[in-house]
Curated annotation (Swiss-Prot):
<keyword id="KW-0805">Transcription regulation</keyword>
<dbReference type="GO" id="GO:0060862">
    <property type="term" value="P:negative regulation of floral organ abscission"/>
</dbReference>
<dbReference type="InterPro" id="IPR051032">
    <property type="entry name" value="AP2/ERF_TF_ERF_subfamily"/>
</dbReference>
<dbReference type="GO" id="GO:0003700">
    <property type="term" value="F:DNA-binding transcription factor activity"/>
</dbReference>
<keyword id="KW-0804">Transcription</keyword>
<keyword id="KW-0539">Nucleus</keyword>
<dbReference type="InterPro" id="IPR036955">
    <property type="entry name" value="AP2/ERF_dom_sf"/>
</dbReference>
<keyword id="KW-0010">Activator</keyword>
<dbReference type="InterPro" id="IPR001471">
    <property type="entry name" value="AP2/ERF_dom"/>
</dbReference>
<comment type="similarity">
    <text>Belongs to the AP2/ERF transcription factor family. ERF subfamily.</text>
</comment>
<keyword id="KW-0936">Ethylene signaling pathway</keyword>
<dbReference type="GO" id="GO:0005634">
    <property type="term" value="C:nucleus"/>
</dbReference>
<dbReference type="GO" id="GO:0009873">
    <property type="term" value="P:ethylene-activated signaling pathway"/>
</dbReference>
<dbReference type="Pfam" id="PF00847">
    <property type="entry name" value="AP2"/>
</dbReference>
<protein>
    <recommendedName>
        <fullName>Ethylene-responsive transcription factor ERF021</fullName>
    </recommendedName>
</protein>
<keyword id="KW-0238">DNA-binding</keyword>
<feature type="compositionally biased region" description="Polar residues">
    <location>
        <begin position="1"/>
        <end position="12"/>
    </location>
</feature>
Amino acid sequence: MAGLRNSGNSDKAQNDGKGVPSAYRGVRKRKWGKWVSEIREPGTKNRIWLGSFETPEMAATAYDVAAFHFRGREARLNFPELASSLPRPADSSSDSIRMAVHEATLCRTTEGTESAMQVDSSSSSNVAPTMVRLSPREIQAINESTLGSPTTMMHSTYDPMEFANDVEMNAWETYQSDFLWDP
């Protein structure tokens, strides 16, 4: 399968047959739906893996952080208007670049969430549930956790007889039984 190649000033992303091309530079979509980003180190054939992301915009922001670090003002960015606000890596190591990428995508996620809340704060019908995917190892760690065990609860400072608004349990039980069980 012949891949798409950048020609001249085209803004189309490259596709080497490994994923769906994107409108953003340095971004492609995997078959299973994740958006990924990577960049080539200048002067070498080495690539730096920037990560896997939920949206193409997050992946494009990741690319912009790395491209701006390596190429400065000469970089062809996906979001040139954000160049001055992008986090800067401490050095050119792949770990430093990924840390800056992580910070940038967190900021982008927060901005997207805040703007979505401002657009329609009166209705929750536009809010989609967030699915959290855990690895089998993370699930096992949660299952083996002692956070909710009786011994942990015995040693906690939580007083089950008192609620946050200072209503005592006996008063609550009386109040609850007055309207729940009466016909």
